[in-house]
């Protein structure tokens, strides 16, 4: 690991010289590329330099302990040595995590799809609450939320809502939200006061550039129809709504929220592109995932990943056994504690895999 880190530091110093070179500064495209590479290496180099400082502290303390010291000073040096050794272990782990191969999608924007599952109207209301939760989380992160497609229920819930969240590192923070979310509470539609269980599914897809997925025109079946809101209100007189079917995979996307057929087609294509990318990625991953399955579960979308229990004010993430008694704050977008714990857990799993 140390040799690898030394090579990275040399590369970083070389890049530092290049980005200060007036000739390269004048070539904006080249300069931007080198700056990006430089900023990607910076956290690794800074952590490596911290590691080297700790090693120096340990060596100096051990040298001191080999000399004749008075009792009080020796005690101080031993304390410093123990602290430095503990810190060395922590920083070593952080370096291993920084050296893990990056998920190429981590910096991308995300397309999120929330669908009401079991539980009828109550599930649709829960889907709307999840949408609000992610929107509030995006606000806290200064990310932008854009609704792409909705299908409302009679009580202002969502049978389905598709939206994009744009911002730095959006996918890296939200990718672990894919799965079945479960709610336990007394529904507004329940007169007997009994607690019901309902579900909603969440899919998190990275936004995909045109070049990343090839979509052939002949593979698409594009239909237009009249748009209509929930319960048939706001019915459009023109055929502005668009339904696109990708014939080889059978994936279907409909969009009717925009006023023009052209805008709905653009949105539908953006969603289709993300779904196809996810579909092909999933095919590649299936074989790898089958080997990875262990006591932590498959990470499959069909798995129940989290429960929101209203009577107890409790949120439990079943993948990592984390329970928080702050349901209200979580539903208001206070998700960092859960997301940080998930990131730490899955990074640890990856460290075990790479040995």
Swiss-Prot record:
Modification after translation: Methylated by PrmC. Methylation increases the termination efficiency of RF1.
Residue list for modification N5-methylglutamine: 233
Entry keyword Protein biosynthesis: yes
Stored PROSITE patterns: RF_PROK_I
Xref: InterPro entries: PCRF, Pep_chain_release_fac_I, Pep_chain_release_fac_I_sf, Prokaryotic/Mito_RF, RF-1
GO MF entries: translation release factor activity, codon specific
SMART domains in UniProt: PCRF
Localization in the cell: Cytoplasm
Main function: Peptide chain release factor 1 directs the termination of translation in response to the peptide chain termination codons UAG and UAA.
Family per similarity comment: Belongs to the prokaryotic/mitochondrial release factor family.
HAMAP family tied to this protein: Rel_fac_1
PANTHER family, per database record: LD18447P
Protein name per UniProt: Peptide chain release factor 1
Native source species: Caldicellulosiruptor saccharolyticus (strain ATCC 43494 / DSM 8903 / Tp8T 6331)
